[in-house]
Amino acid sequence: LKRTHYCTQVTTADIGKEVVVGGFTAKQRDKGELVFIDLRDRTGIIQLIFDDSTDRAVMQKAKEVRSEYVLMAKGTVRRRESINPDIPTGEIEIFVTELRILAKAQTPPFHITDETDTNEELRLRYRYLDLRRKQLQDNLMKRARITKVTRDFFADNGFIEIDTPMMIKSTPEGARDYVVPSRIHKGSFYALPQSPQI
């Protein structure tokens, strides 16, 4: 399966069309003959639906899905029976005909939501999970846009960007250094700097 849309790119204009979306499972609700999955990607959330007309194997997969599983889903866009005005895709849902579980996940140590009361130490320990929160993703996207605008400005004004390695004295703490031998001072070594890991 190859993604055709990000979650919030699917709109009411796509009703009746077949789409492929992918992302993380924000929530799974099993109501017996009905299964709902809120699929989250970097743009937002869309609801996937499975009912008694869904292929048995696909329905079984949907029932196995847990929080933060990575999924790809193919299906037909249709209007939701109960509209959710709180999200951009609240008027639509995807009736899934094909579901792939790309990666399973253990139960996360905290809920990945914008409003979290999780202590900072736990969030930093699981930074890769914390970065899935919309607030932090928005910060990363803003930073990327600012960096691009800055680079474009300097490039348009004749500047050349040059990335050079910076040699520093090796430090005993932290991660393993990438050691570079000195050509001038035989037997001496430099280390490439370590980037902060937060």
Where are these regions (language model features)?
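Class II aminoacyl-tRNA synthetase-like tRNA-binding/catalytic domains
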Residues: K2-I198
